[in-house]
Curated annotation (Swiss-Prot):
One of its GO terms (cellular component) is nucleolus. Involved in the 18S rRNA synthesis. Required for the early cleavages at sites A0, A1 and A2. This is Pre-rRNA-processing protein esf1. Residues 471-597 form a coiled coil. GO terms for molecular function: RNA binding. It comes from Schizosaccharomyces pombe (strain 972 / ATCC 24843) (Fission yeast). It comes from the Eukaryota. The modification Phosphothreonine is found at T121. InterPro entries: Esf1, NUC153, RRM_ESF1.
Length: 682
């Protein structure tokens, strides 16, 4: 019997009775959005890379039982994969296989034995664990054959990688005899200083050992390269040529996607905001150049003994300096090698108290994208600018490494000295008004003509005088001003001494015409004397000997001084007098001044009774009741009572009446205003 014919799924093959003839839905029959998919289109087609999808057990692992504990069919996972996935060449191969079945029956029977053996080997290989890093399964093979193959592949790939990175193959350099000096080579000297090496290597010294000095010298290779870079800049090989056109393969790829060669050029505006991808450099040559910069300098480490140098060599050689990707490359220096002829870049003999290492990474040793460091800013200078210094740090800091000299390098020092000597020892007759002492003598001799006199304002003179002050640092400016103030005070003291010695009528010129050093009070007195309106003011501090004797005189009749009393003794005596037993002790106390009586009517102490600041408060805990205090309080009461008697003439009462009248007038005026507002509102 033939196969049962099924109705086609396509809408065109349907019977006319099922077709909707409504013109509103006419587009449904032709619109692909409403057409049904074919069964073959349900499957996802995969290429040969995913051929193991149907064979690998990892894609077919399912649960052995369902959620109710019933056993599941293990072929369900295989059927599910066949239903969803299909290889690209599977559809075409299925038709060809059906036609060739009859021809290959004999071949299949003959090769059945071989296939069985292959299946056995496949099953054995499947039982073995396979290394799959994606799933984290399997064990790395450690057989000798794999090691040999890996070694061969590494040896084949190593020259290519080193050549691509610009790294020269390692040389077998002999270690040599052990000495107390070590050389450090192949380091990033743009970021490393002698202090960094001194501190880092000092931490590896054995007990009792120490570093004496770390010096950094330029190598012969570095001297020649730096001299060439000073004139010509970095080598041209590191830059890509300007006429670098895309290759034929790139053009073919661009034309394949519909891009024209002219469209690849960007506008100027796009170039301004274009990201720096390093396309202007040849990365291989740039990396090689950056690695060559590691050989521009070398460091010499001097230890106190051979034992210390040996320990540092064995510990640090081949280790990384912090996280900078720089590897210590240490060599012993023979004793007969000297560095007296070489000029060191920097020397460190002592670790600073507050040391902070710099965090840096050498891109040429670690990153795929290398940056050119030839024109980079000095990283130590950047740290110096950002750091907040104390006054002691500023004094200890050496600015000579970061500030250029004020004198020109091309100018001879002897010529400058001779010019200054001409300025100091030259006569006024020989000096020309329009000549410059810093010009060459040949120019001065050739300048013949009339003398031209020019006048400059005082502002220009002050600006020229203060030009040197602008170049001063903060500390130098502070010290200079302090010295000027000290000198000014000294000159003022000398001026006063000379005035006292010579007298007021002396007209001797002291050599000071500056108005700053003149006494303001003296100038005022001189002006008044010239006008004749005022006489010269006498010094109020001058006192005669008689007045001083009166202030400290002693009473001839009394043995004690007039101002001699002891307040503590007086308070004790007042307390002892209240107790009969202690009355005798009160008479033995000194400094009582028993015969002294205060003159409460003295006008000099009138403020005690009028000023509230001197009012006495008996409730205050610091109040001390004595005879003199009680006398003062009685006097204040008398004066207050006298003031009340003097007010009987009625003046205070009149003031009170006036205030009451003023308040009444204000109330009447307010009532009038309220009434007027009410009338206007009606």
């Amino acid at each position: 019997m033939g196969k049962k014919q099924t109705k086609p799924i396509n809408a065109k093959s349907r019977s006319e009775s099922n077709v909707v003839a409504d013109p509103r839905f006419q587009s449904v029959h032709s619109d692909p959005r409403f057409s049904r998919l074919k069964r073959g289109n349900f499957k996802v087609k995969v290429d040969e890379r995913f051929k193991s999808l149907k064979e690998d057990k990892d894609f077919k692992t399912t649960a052995s039982v369902d959620r109710y504990g019933r056993p599941l069919n293990q072929d369900k996972a295989t059927k599910e994969i066949d239903r969803l996935y299909e290889l690209e060449n599977e559809g075409s191969s299925s038709s060809s296989e059906s036609s060739e079945i009859t021809d290959n029956e004999e071949v299949a029977s003959a090769s059945s034995k071989s296939t069985k053996s292959e299946e056995l080997t496949d099953e054995e290989s499947e039982d073995e664990e396979v290394y799959d890093p994606a799933r984290g399964e399997g064990i790395i093979s450690t057989s000798e054959s794999s090691d040999e193959s890996d070694a061969e592949s590494e040896t084949e790939a190593q020259p290519e990688i080193s050549e691509l990175a610009g790294i020269e193959p390692e040389e077998n350099i002999p270690r040599g005899s052990e000495t107390n000096r070590l050389a450090v080579v192949n380091m990033d000297w743009d970021n490393l200083q002698a202090v960094d090496l001194f501190v880092a290597l000092s931490s590896f010294c054995p007990p009792g050992g120490k570093l004496l000095k770390v010096s950094i010298y330029p190598s012969e290779f570095g001297k020649s390269r730096m001299a060439a870079e000073h004139v010509q800049g970095p080598p041209r090989d590191i830059f890509t040529p300007a006429d670098n056109q895309p290759s034929s393969a790139e053009l073919h790829e661009a034309q394949k996607f519909g891009f024209d060669n002219n469209e690849s050029d960007q506008d100027e505006e796009d170039a301004l905001i274009e990201e720096d991808l390093g396309n202007e450099f040849d990365m291989v040559k740039l990396r090689q150049y950056q690695l060559e910069r590691l050989r521009y300098y070398y460091a010499v480490v001097e230890c106190d003994s051979v034992r210390t140098a040996k320990v540092i060599y064995e510990t640090c050689d081949g280790a990384e300096y912090e996280t900078s990707a720089n590897i210590y490359d240490l060599r012993f220096i023979p004793d007969d090698v000297t560095f007296d002829d070489d000029e060191s870049r920097e020397v460190c003999t002592k670790a600073p108290e507050k040391y902070e290492p710099r965090d840096f990474v050498t891109d040429a040793l670690q990153h795929s994208k290398v940056k050119l460091s030839w024109d980079a800013e000095d990283p130590h200078r950047k740290d110096l600018i950002k750091k907040a210094f104390t006054s002691q740090d500023i004094e200890d800091l050496d600015f000579s490494a970061y500030i250029a000299s004020s004198e020109s390098e091309d100018e001879d020092v002897d010529v400058i000295r001779s010019r200054y000597q001409k300025l100091l020892s030259g006569d006024a007759d020989d000096f020309q008004a329009n000549s410059n002492p810093f010009e060459d003598d040949d120019k001065l001799e050739g300048a013949n003509g009339e003398m031209e006199v020019t006048f400059t304002s005082g502002f220009d003179v002050d600006n020229n005088a203060n030009s040197s002050e602008k170049d001063e640092t903060t500390i130098e400016k502070y010290k200079r001003k302090a010295a000027e103030r000290k000198q000014r005070r000294k000159e003022l003291r000398q001026l006063k001494k000379t005035k006292d010695d010579e007298g007021e009528g002396s007209d001797v010129d002291l050599g000071f015409d500056d108005p700053f050093f003149k006494d303001k009070d003296a100038s005022r007195n001189n002006k008044k004397n010239k006008k004749g309106k005022h006489t010269q003011i006498e010094d109020p501090t001058a006192a005669s000997k008689e007045e001083l004797e009166n202030l400290v005189r002693e009473d001839e009749n009394d043995s004690e001084q007039l101002d001699h009393f002891d307040m503590k003794s007086i308070l004790k005596a007042e307390k002892f007098k209240k107790n009969r037993k202690l009355k005798k002790k009160a008479s033995n106390l000194e400094g009582l001044q028993e015969g002294f009586e205060a003159d409460v009517s003295d006008p000099r102490f009138a403020a005690l009774y009028t000023n509230h600041n001197f009012a006495l408060d008996p409730t205050n805990p610091h109040f001390k009741r004595t005879k003199t205090v009680e006398k003062i309080m009685d006097e204040s009461r008398k004066r207050r009572s006298n003031q009340l008697e003097q007010t009987q003439d009625g003046k205070p009462e009149l003031k009170i009446k006036k205030r009451k009248a003023e308040k009444g007038d204000q109330r009447q005026e307010l009532d009038r205003i309220v009434k007027s507002i009410k009338r206007s509102g009606k």
